[in-house]
A protein has these predicted regions:
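Beta-strand-enriched cores of mature, soluble protein domains
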Residues: 11-174
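Secretory targeting and sorting signals
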Residues: 1-11
């Protein structure tokens, strides 16, 4: 009797790092409310890694991101704070054989909105899945030359509680 063990290709880290960004944006007719203008002050911090997986050694992306957005009504200076922690992870990467990759992504993590007193007024602790299409630049295993082509859509809607953001925020800042 001969026992044959086929080895699996091991994962290799292609790239990893951390990121930080801060910016502000002015949003008119916020939440489709005519005349409601808010300033959104955004802080983003996170880390990411790209690893190869499977027999084809295709790249899989994973990130952990914290986002803090303060929405301030420019007329009244009333504000709310949205705090989100997201883990995004490629669940499946498919080489379509035509120079493109289809990627199924899982996004999960809590998002909460707090009023000025610190009370939570809206939450979304769920997860959802979506697919994207990338041009692989002729090199399926090298993500450095990939280009985003298209958002293919939500595959699985958000699970769990999903409070209406605008229904909670507009009264709090008006």
């Amino acid at each position: 009797m001969v026992l044959s063990l086929a080895g699996h290709a091991s994962a290799k880290v292609i790239e990893k790092g951390a990121f930080h960004d801060e910016f502000s944006d002015r949003i008119g007719n916020f939440c489709d409310v005519s005349g409601l203008t808010v300033r959104a002050d955004v802080t983003v911090d996170g880390s990411f890694a790209i690893r190869t997986h499977g027999a084809d050694q295709l790249p899989y992306y994973q990130s952990h991101t914290s986002v803090r957005v303060v929405y301030t009504n420019v007329a009244t200076n009333q504000y709310v704070t949205e705090v989100t922690r997201v883990m995004e992870k490629d669940l499946r990467v498919t080489d379509n054989g035509d120079g493109t990759l289809t990627i199924l992504v899982l996004a999960t993590g809590p998002s909460s909105v707090y009023d000025e007193s610190g009370k939570a007024i809206a939450r979304n602790p769920g997860q959802f899945r979506y697919e994207i299409l990338l041009d692989n630049g002729g090199t399926p295993s090298d993500p450095s030359d990939d280009e985003f082509l298209k958002f293919l859509g939500v595959v699985k809607e958000s699970t769990g509680r999903t409070d209406d953001f605008c229904a909670a925020v507009v009264p709090a800042i008006s």
